[in-house]
């Protein structure tokens, strides 16, 4: 006879199931489980007196015969593709199967075989997401990588050589020599890393040698001179060598206006950084380009979301980051021209509409590397409070909005940079770069981070305690973050040209190198749940922003979730 159990008791034992709802952290965002791929009455769970025991939920199957390396049981998957419950099997550092785990000799419907060689991670009552991808990194100091990992990021792309003044302002690793040194340094870190070369040149040779030297992208930055000629040259090299171009346009409008920049692009794909403009770009109307099909628009996190403190903190940030002098009137005017409450307010709404597609940090250069996820969900919560439910929602939940926002730091930057076939979502065959969350701490403090199927970070108590939970409990590096394991759980992304030329062997790299691909034959329409292309107009006198004729404005937030209450310890 089948047993009956209350929803509350079931959720407490096996985690929420179809129709159950839960809150994300302390936000107003409510998600609902859409479907459950496990089987009622046949759930697998590890522990004393539980299911994953020899001859019960654990089969005799060897690894060679098909048993997985790791099973994450009864996890609530939150992904751009949906919000659903499943067991997840990991093998060879990748997601082998999403479905029902157990012993096929004793249980029906098993498609993830648990064997004697299988480790178990309890996903009951936990949320599982893909690792985050920050595509706007200034590699100013290596300590950023630890902060990023402990926030739920597993991939970082950007440029720099350390605290050189070029790196303090621009995300470029200039020249093949510097790129080589950064690729060699990448071997030491439990993080997927990728580097952008300097794209500012009017002739192609110096750009081509950087791509061949391992750069997987090229960055055009106004501090190096983002002229129409440089834009055209950089995009031509990118088209020929299949790498993405990121652009920070000309704030001062010295070499042209936004229309001249768009004309120089000639409809070619480009990733536009901080498209609102506070982080840099044609003043006051760079935000217009988010309506172009060939532009992949992103935000950096200091303007996310618009709050009562946003404008004030930006001026000082800008003066430091761009090597400006408060005693020079022109420098002050340059800084003030970039900070506009009207365009920052509009940016909130454009994200909620799906017209801005990506959120990244701009680490230590007008951005906070450990706050990509927090700022994304704070924006989603602010828009939920101010704009209500999205028209696309189909139930008494915020599932569509949550899927839209998680895509901004997972699958969309991955697609934009040619690595969406490897990372960015929870899909069979992709790398097992995964983050496990307690729902109460979602987006703030991960419970566990896996990189290539290996645990690299987790919340951990006193190492001298008799059990792992006594205080102080905080995120600490795990075994995957040490020794030779680092070389095998993380990868380095490079251009196809460098990969085919044997960049790994040439530089003696220990980490596997993977080539980026298909960065050029894409447009905004390829970005998931964030591909709206409204006609944007900016009033040059008032800075008011309109999308398809509708004024975009909202009030700054005075209080945010996922903030001080989470950082008392």
UniProtKB/Swiss-Prot annotation:
The protein's enzyme class: hydrolase
Biological-process GO terms, alphabetical: urea catabolic process
Binding residues for Ni(2+) 1: 136, 138, 219, 362
PROSITE patterns in alphabetical order: UREASE_1, UREASE_2, UREASE_3
Active site: 322 (proton donor)
Gene Ontology cellular-component annotations: cytoplasm
Subcellular location(s) of the protein: Cytoplasm
Assembly and oligomerization: Heterotrimer of UreA (gamma), UreB (beta) and UreC (alpha) subunits. Three heterotrimers associate to form the active enzyme.
Protein name per Swiss-Prot or TrEMBL: Urease subunit alpha
Gene expressing this chain: ureC
